Design a protein with these regions (language model features):
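Active-site-proximal cap/lid insertion segments
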Residues: 1-178, 187-195, 242-247, 269, ...
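Segments surrounding the PLD/"HKD" phosphodiesterase catalytic module and close analogs
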Residues: 201, 271-273
């Protein structure tokens, strides 16, 4: 932006800022760590100290996930510096404090960008998108990494500022990150590439629509196949897990309006997939999951689904 200002460049621009934090290792700045009572803990043999300023445990915290997710031994679950395999209160609260400190630093850096845009008179003519590629567990459901399809990992922040967008407005519709390209092209008034698979959500940004996607499909197959799949429609969400040998085979059904943190039986909330009252909804969501797997050419099937000659 400084170079653009110096050369008096007026050509439309796109700048991408990629921050590694709050991905681990979450080594925050001392002054920001102090704000959250956290330390850059390096002692693998012992947990960090508890501090009153550390964030509280998440509502869906567990000391251990209740079953094998099909990739429980992945690096993010056993080797993250500062936590490793511990899920005790002190380790989790300290690590969330480190996450917050790293996120605060990103806020500071974005503030520098906004200030420069304001100084050059381009702030009100620039679309700014703040998002991430995935969330992170850090103690939620007894997990640490991103290898799962719970909301704390599958859902990402998405904030947009720019011309024609009502400040402070909020919508709860579904989008994929692949929709960003189509949206930017739409906002710029240019044709999307032929290879684009996304859908523009410009009408959502301008208030003309509330949703562009009724259904979201999620997949994680980095471990034992077929792995994990999820489908979400409205308030309802289904997650299915299965390993190739059948040793891990689980189904979860959530109503996110009633259970936004996806609390489990271990939290005192029943799994709706096991509740006869929700048998019809379970079948409906399972059918929707299969339909999405077929529509998107998913090469795997669960044992309770048709093989489709794959």
């Amino acid at each position: 932006l400084g170079e653009r200002e110096a050369t008096k460049d007026t050509v439309p621009f796109l700048i991408y800022y990629g921050f590694s934090h709050p991905h681990d290792t979450r080594d925050g700045k001392p002054e920001l760590l102090a704000k959250y009572g956290a330390t850059n803990h390096t002692d693998e043999a012992n947990p960090p100290s508890l501090h009153s300023l550390q964030p509280p445990l998440p509502a869906n915290y567990l000391a251990k996930h209740p079953f094998d997710t099909t990739d429980s031994g992945v690096r993010d679950e056993v080797a993250v510096s500062g936590v490793w395999q511990r899920r005790d209160e002190a380790s989790i609260r300290n690590e969330i404090g480190r996450q917050y400190a790293c996120s605060d630093n990103i806020d500071i850096q974005i503030g520098r960008v906004l200030k420069k845009l304001e100084e050059t008179g381009e702030l009100d003519n620039t679309y700014i998108i703040y998002t991430a590629d995935h969330g992170m567990s850090i103690g939620r459901h007894g997990l640490m990494g991103k290898q799962n399809l719970y909301q704390h990992t599958w859902r990402v922040p998405f904030i947009v500022k720019g011309p024609g967008i009502q400040p402070g407005s909020r919508v709860e519709g579904n989008i994929y990150l692949l929709d960003v390209l189509a949206t930017l092209c739409d906002l710029a008034g240019i044709t999307t590439p032929e290879t684009n698979e996304g859908t523009s959500f410009k009408p959502v940004l301008t208030g003309e629509k509330k949703i562009i996607r009724d259904v979201l499909y999620g997949t994680y197959a980095g471990g034992a196949k077929p792995g994990m799949r999820a489908v979400k429609q409205g308030d309802w969400k289904l997650i299915q897990y299965e390993s190739a040998d059948g040793s891990a085979k689980h189904t979860q059904l959530f109503n996110l309006a009633e259970n936004p943190h996806e609390l489990l039986p271990e939290h005192g909330r029943p799994n709706l997939a096991d509740d006869p009252k929700h048998a019809d909804k379970l079948k409906e969501m399972q059918a929707l999951l299969l339909a999405e797997m077929r529509r998107l050419d998913d090469p795997w099937r669960f044992s309770n689904q048709p093989g489709d000659d794959l």
